[in-house]
């Protein structure tokens, strides 16, 4: 069959040529003990959720500048694996600023003491954010949706 995986018309999104009305939920993995991730994600799937969005909250992963923690309840890779096992797609909200009711909008405390203003076009700020995004990429590179993925 020759069609794009995702398309749309004036009525809906099409996935693999069929009408699809995605339902999305929210789960903050770094605020939930990792032993419950799969259970909660499978409950979401059973409730009709197709996609779960999740903040990657910077302050939860780099409390100390240059020291990243992707273990335990902060294991983004493991969280995505759990979602995959439950049949839920993940939409990451990588910020760097987040509105997840978290201190500093998720910015690490150390970032606020730098000689630049966060959330601006300052090159120094962009440089720090680029390092953060590179860390996220290392956690998710095996799961990035490509045009031929289901």
Please give the residue ranges for each predicted region.
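Alpha-helical context
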Residues: 1, 5, 13-20, 55-59, ...
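N-terminal carbohydrate-binding accessory modules
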Residues: 1-51
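Aromatic-lined substrate-binding rim segments of carbohydrate-active enzymes
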Residues: 37-110
